[in-house]
Amino acid sequence: MVLLAAAVCTKAGKAIVSRQFVEMTRTRIEGLLAAFPKLMNTGKQHTFVETESVRYVYQPMEKLYMVLITTKNSNILEDLETLRLFSRVIPEYCRALEENEISEHCFDLIFAFDEIVALGYRENVNLAQIRTFTEMDSHEEKVFRAVRETQEREAKAEMRRKAKELQQARRDAERQGKKAPGFGGFGSSAVSGGSTAAMITETIIETDKPKVAPAPARPSGPSKALKLGAKGKEVDNFVDKLKSEGETIMSSSMGKRTSEASKMHAPPINMESVHMKIEEKITLTCGRDGGLQNMELHGMIMLRISDDKYGRIRLHVENEDKKGVQLQTHPNVDKKLFTAESLIGLKNPEKSFPVNSDVGVLKWRLQTTEESFIPLTINCWPSESGNGCDVNIEYELQEDNLELNDVVITIPLPSGVGAPVIGEIDGEYRHDSRRNTLEWCLPVIDAKNKSGSLEFSIAGQPNDFFPVQVSFVSKKNYCNIQVTKVTQVDGNSPVRFSTETTFLVDKYEIL
């Protein structure tokens, strides 16, 4: 099969996006596409037409056509299979099959087309692999960003907690008719109330702003910042200033959850000479009225050996999954040994695993539409009121053995209507006025904290608050597949090993 070009065009033959896989001029491809509508015979059910030099294989998509231009001696069955893959790629990047939407995402489509065909020949890829390749996803980068964002949120939360304590102390002192104490009296390291307020204000505000360069140190002389020991109103002004900057004063329940999240972040894993990475990624789509449209989970065990004396080993796998996952071992792994004894070892026991490289020894896949398999259910209830919409969002953890960390539930908002008015909330929130989104942030969701809700009001229509997107990380995998023991092939002696488990979100949407 030689594929000359792939294009999306209108019914009149106007090219919207076209990718040529062989050397071809713009005039040539435009001429081929312009001639295409004239060759079609509406009275026939064929999805291909031929000329003296090329063959058009096409599929209608509402008002557009997905067209493949191939040589006449290509395999028509392979052409049709490739055409179906091209047609499935387009809805992945375009919400509507319209000319404006295709033009807006033309580069994304071209990158995806290049993953399907190389130099005119079809690559052996599926839709999930195309999505992964075009996203250029990095697990390490996601983990690094998640840890950094959590540290920033914890620092902001601590500053807000201190500000609230200062405000409460001031009010208590005013009730008793006393003047609130300042922050002096600690010897040579004494700090005035004014400089402390300046430090707190600067820390909280700077956290949300991109850091261009390190801020210069403030002089220890007189400061024009707020002085907490002066007037009672200045403390209230300080808190109001936080609110005007878009910050939210944290409640006591939020402080409790933040402390729990800080306990979760353990120091980096001490990697042994035999190290395993167990990674799972979930793709899930639910309907706003309930029902699981699709859930797909991919998992893999990656083995890394840093000492060649441990090259000839076997992994003892404990599979407690009851959801019906499909397991697949590496081609060099003894499949009979794994099926009979749940041991991962090479077919030739005299050979060693590669050293200083990550080797995928076992992978699994789960695809279902069973609602009971959803790890975290999200219910979004927008109801129209006189001034706009009252939105109530609830979450519930269905898998009690999971512990989800750094959970962010992102709700789209109408543009140009201002910030939402928050009612009750479990956790904390961020309003991104540039992207018109409301982010509901929850440090930890586990069996002790398995449900919560958020209520807010804003102008808009119910459809404005979808799709809702969810992201999280977890150090417990979903399918309950673990490596419990590692032994050497000779003598069956145990080997020390370390394990790193990660459960990530690839795509989690409520449409």
Swiss-Prot record:
MHD domain span: 271-511
Any single GO BP term: Golgi localization
N6-acetyllysine modification, residue list: 233, 241, 309, 351
The keyword Transport is assigned to this record: yes
Region (Disordered): 167-188
Tree of life domain: Eukaryota
CDD domains given in the database record: AP_delta-COPI_MHD (cd09254), Delta_COP_N (cd14830)
Keywords, ordered alphabetically: Acetylation, Cytoplasm, Cytoplasmic vesicle, ER-Golgi transport, Golgi apparatus, Membrane, Phosphoprotein, Protein transport, Transport
UniProt biased composition (Basic and acidic residues): 167-177
Record's keyword annotation contains Phosphoprotein: yes
Any one cellular-component term (Gene Ontology): COPI vesicle coat
Modified residues (Phosphoserine): 223, 244, 493
Subcellular location, record wording: Cytoplasm; Golgi apparatus membrane; Cytoplasmic vesicle, COPI-coated vesicle membrane
Main location: cytoplasm
InterPro entries documented for this protein: AP2_Mu_C_sf, AP_mu_sigma_su, Coatomer_dsu, Longin-like_dom_sf, MHD
Membrane topology: Peripheral membrane protein
Function noted in UniProt: The coatomer is a cytosolic protein complex that binds to dilysine motifs and reversibly associates with Golgi non-clathrin-coated vesicles, which further mediate biosynthetic protein transport from the ER, via the Golgi up to the trans Golgi network. Coatomer complex is required for budding from Golgi membranes, and is essential for the retrograde Golgi-to-ER transport of dilysine-tagged proteins.
Subunit structure: Oligomeric complex that consists of at least the alpha, beta, beta', gamma, delta, epsilon and zeta subunits.
Membership in a protein family: Belongs to the adaptor complexes medium subunit family. Delta-COP subfamily.
UniProt-recorded name of the protein: Coatomer subunit delta
